[in-house]
Structure formats: structure tokens, C-alpha cells
Regions:
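Pocket-lining segment of extracytoplasmic ligand-binding domains
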Residues: 183-273, 284
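Solvent-exposed, acidic/flexible segments
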Residues: 67-75, 93-97, 130-134, 163-174, ...
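Bilobed "Venus flytrap"/periplasmic-binding protein-like clamshell domains
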Residues: 57-85, 139-204
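Beta->alpha turn/N-cap motifs
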Residues: 93-97, 107-119, 195, 211-218, ...
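N-terminal hydrophobic or amphipathic helices and topogenic motifs
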Residues: 1-98, 105, 123-126, 131-135, ...
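Signal peptide-directed extracytoplasmic domains
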Residues: 111-153, 174
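Sec/Tat-exported extracytoplasmic proteins
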Residues: 82, 86, 108, 113-116, ...
Length: 354
């Protein structure tokens, strides 16, 4: 029986291209013939979007802190992250975390870096938390011979100590700890000066010790940690403080965390830590909130971790302040599915609609 000649296979890829081309031409023809109906519809949709949610501002202000502080350093990194989305982030210097609360409540800034435990004032209800992004230990730096396992009352006796300045988070936390020890700070031994001046005075021997609340990003902290003859007080009762003050955690700076040759620190150091928090008003545009949250996540991914409990940020910790709805979705689901593929404000809009 003679074989039947084989039929050539259809050129599938060519057929698909022709079908797609035909569909696109038909779609274009439909647009051209019905533009008088389609264009007004598009304009109405755009107008509704603007009415329901205005465009995000081109400039945002955030209160940071003192020069060389953790908040200033983080703010500079956030400013670069915002610039990638063509948003200008203005860094507004301040006395510190407590002062930042006043700035945001008075409307002078749109957002602020703060810390757990600061007084929220009478208008705390308008604040929303965008989460905690890092630990900020309470450091007690001192000069002279290294002291081990000493009670704070005994350690501070006859020492001249800087408590930082009113309005700073360092001052707030230092006063709370000293009050718990029933230490009277209204004496000449306790002086008032900002972190930079305290650092200089400690180096010169004009004071014996200084309190400062700051993360490892702070240039002041790095300067002091690298200075010969300057030591860190070991808060050996850190667990007791953490039980008394709910906004504090007991953390450890592990032996060798700073350097392995020579080993620095030479032993584990117990510290108390609050957190760096991002606060905003309940009126801050949701798309701008997403920029802050994304910048916080990128900051955490790129930074070096030093402390024993450093791997849980960013997260919501200070429950005194309501968590923003945008932050709640972000911590649960991450960035919107259009993030990185569309302008940030469109990704934010679809995130809420979806």
C-alpha cells in the first residue's frame, strides 16, 4: 500500500503572530472609532482618583535629632531612598526624640523619628506608628579605669555626668533610670549639654561620664567605642529594668562584636535598649507612608547587626501609638505587587483597592 505524503505542519508561531497583530489592529480601530466615548471616560476616572485620593506631596519633612545622632544618619539614608522616587525628604534637626513629638503635633513636620518611652503629650491620638526600625541602647560611657559589676548608685557617686539636654530621648531615659534608683539629679554633678559637647568634654576630662541613647549608626557612639580610655558601663541588672519599664529590652553587645583582633569588647556587655520609631500623623498620604516603610526595610537589610536580638526589624512594638493601616498591611504582606513596576503612588493606590 503506497504511503500517503506527509502534510506540512502548520506554522503555529506565525499563526499566533498574525492573530495577535489582528487583535491589536482591531483594538486600535475600536479606539479610533470610539474615542469620543473613551476619552471622557478616562478623564472621569482620573478625576475620581484625584478626588478620592490626592496626589502625594513632592516634599516631605521629617524631624531627626542632634548632629551625628542615629536619627540623623538614618534620615540621610532615607533621603536617598525617597530621591529615587522623585520625592524630596527634608531633614529637620531637633533636640531629640521628645522634641520631635512637639514638632509633629504642631504640624511643623510630616513625620518624626522617636523612641519608645517618650511622653506623647496631649495630642498623641493624631499620631500613627510606622513601626520600630532598630534598637537604640542607653549607653553610659565613662573615662578612667574599667569598672566591672558595679551598682549604678555606687558607680555614679562623686562622678560628674552629662544627662544630655531637655527634649532629647537620652535625657528622658536617663532621668527615668536615675529616678528608679532614687538618685537626685538636681546637683552640680549632673550637667546639661548635648551629645556632641558631652563627647568633647569627656575626651578632655571635663566630665567623667555621659548618657546617650543611640544606635550603632551614630557617629558619636562609634567615636567613643574606638577611643582608648573610654569604657561602657555594664548594666548587669538589665533584665530588672526591662521588667519595670515595658518599652525597654535587655540586650547584649557580644564579646568581639566590634572587632576580633584585638577582641572588642573583651567581654559581653549588658545594655538597655529602646527602639527607633517612625511616627506620622493620621493625615500623612498612604503612598508616602509606603516610602517610609520600604526605606526602613532596605535600611535593615543593608546594616550590620551587633546585638543579640537585632534580627526582628522593622516591626510594630510601641503599642501606645496606633499602628497605621498601611503599616499593618506592609508588615503582613510586604510591598504591593506593583511595587517596582509602576510609580510608587500607583502601586499604593492599587494596594488599597486590591
Amino acid at each position: 500500500m503506497p504511503r500517503r505524503p506527509k502534510k506540512p505542519l502548520p506554522k503555529v508561531s506565525r499563526n499566533y503572530r498574525e492573530i495577535i497583530a489582528d487583535e491589536l489592529l482591531a483594538f486600535w480601530a475600536s479606539l479610533v472609532s470610539n474615542w469620543i466615548f473613551i476619552l471622557p471616560s478616562i478623564l472621569v476616572i482620573v478625576a475620581l482618583v484625584h478626588l478620592v485620593r490626592p496626589m502625594p506631596p513632592a516634599t516631605v519633612r521629617i524631624a531627626t535629632g542632634q548632629p551625628n545622632s542615629t536619627s540623623e544618619v538614618i534620615g540621610q539614608q532615607f533621603r536617598e531612598a525617597f530621591a529615587k522616587h522623585h520625592v524630596k525628604l527634608e531633614l529637620i534637626p531637633s533636640s531629640g526624640a521628645q522634641d520631635n513629638i512637639k514638632l509633629i503635633e504642631s504640624g511643623q513636620v510630616d513625620a518624626a523619628f522617636s523612641q519608645g518611652g517618650v511622653d506623647l503629650g496631649e495630642h498623641g491620638g493624631v499620631l500613627r506608628s510606622l513601626g520600630s526600625i532598630a534598637y537604640q541602647p542607653l549607653w553610659l560611657f565613662y573615662r578612667g579605669p574599667e569598672v566591672k559589676q558595679q551598682d549604678l548608685n555606687h558607680f555614679l557617686k562623686d562622678r560628674t555626668v552629662s544627662l544630655n539636654i531637655p527634649g532629647s530621648g537620652s535625657r528622658v531615659l536617663a532621668e527615668q533610670i536615675l529616678q528608679a534608683h532614687e538618685i537626685n539629679i538636681d546637683t552640680p554633678r549632673f550637667v546639661t549639654m548635648n551629645a556632641s559637647d558631652s563627647l568633647k568634654a569627656l575626651h578632655k576630662g571635663e566630665i567623667d561620664a555621659m548618657f546617650v541613647v543611640a544606635g550603632m549608626e551614630s557617629r558619636n557612639v562609634l567615636d567613643l567605642l574606638e577611643s582608648p580610655g573610654i569604657h561602657v558601663f555594664d548594666f548587669n541588672m538589665a533584665d530588672a529594668y526591662a521588667r519595670r519599664f515595658k518599652y525597654l529590652d535587655a540586650i547584649v553587645l557580644p564579646r568581639g562584636a566590634l572587632d576580633l583582633s584585638p577582641v572588642s569588647p573583651s567581654t559581653n556587655i549588658n545594655l538597655l535598649a529602646t527602639t527607633v520609631d517612625i511616627l506620622a500623623t493620621d493625615q500623612l498620604h498612604p503612598a508616602i507612608q509606603l516610602l517610609f516603610l520600604d526605606a526602613a526595610r532596605n535600611f535593615d537589610e543593608k546594616r550590620t547587626t551587633f546585638f543579640s536580638m537585632d534580627g526582628k526589624f522593622p516591626t510594630y512594638m510601641d503599642t501606645r501609638i496606633p499602628e497605621s493601616e498601611v503599616a499593618r498591611r506592609f508588615f503582613k504582606e510586604g510591598t504591593p505587587f506593583l511595587w517596582g513596576y509602576a510609580p510608587y503612588w500607583i502601586a499604593s493606590l492599587f494596594d488599597e483597592i486590591w
